[in-house]
Amino acid sequence: MAVPIRGVRPMRWVGSLVAEGLLVALLTAAATSAVAAGGVIAIDVGHYREAPGVTSAHGRPEFEFNRDLAAEIEAQLQARGRSTQLIGAAGEMNSLPARPRAAAGAALLVSVHHDSMQARLLSSWTYEGVERRYGDRFAGFSLFVSRENPGWRRGLRCASAIGAALIHAGFTPSLYHADRKVGENRAFADKRNGVHYFDRLAVLRHASMPALLFEAGVIVNREEEKQLADPAVRGRIAAAVVNGIEECMP
């Protein structure tokens, strides 16, 4: 049997609890909505273990650089309350179209890579008893968007914002991809911020959401590779990428 509490009407007491519960639920929902207001940011780890991309000047596969930087970008996004999705981190995703499909529903797809240069521009050297290929001629980051992506204009805004944030943080765009002779003649979408058009790039054109590809630096460049492998530098790059995303996806 319920024991009445002196001075309190039972139905009013129950109603108060119900109202309080509803208030808590509403506040929780509002907080959750605020965190996810910018939508999910999908971060694609470029390449996979069986085809790990370019080999760095010191013999490390690109996939490992991509995985480490993507994880740092995700961690910093989450630290700012952003919802994230990491794609391909296990190194088993061998289908390019599967990557944007995995990101379905995300607000933005960022594919993380590290750069090389044309084979004819590379030289040979020996490191730890193994002959390696390197090229010290170019360094710096680059960004790419595809006009075959339905959200390419937003993708371009985000790429430009990321490029601007990287420059503000002290990094330099490579720019050589636009050169007819030493690059691939990739037209500039935003030269100042190191953004190029790459319309046929599969991971971008197959995406249903705004998408961009980020080349963090040139790992066949012996000096730049050392910098890109430094956790402190990686943290600075990730912070700049996140600042750019925050600018274009408020």
Describe these PLM feature segments:
Residues M1-V14:
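N-terminal secretory signal peptides that target proteins for export/translocation
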Residues S16-A30:
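Bacterial N-terminal signal peptides
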Residues D44, E62, E215:
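Acidic active-site catalytic centers that drive phospho-/nucleotidyl reactions
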Residues G38-G39, F65-P250:
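Active-site-proximal helix/loop segments of hydrolytic enzymes
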Residues A31-G38:
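Boundary at the C-terminal end of the N-terminal hydrophobic targeting segment
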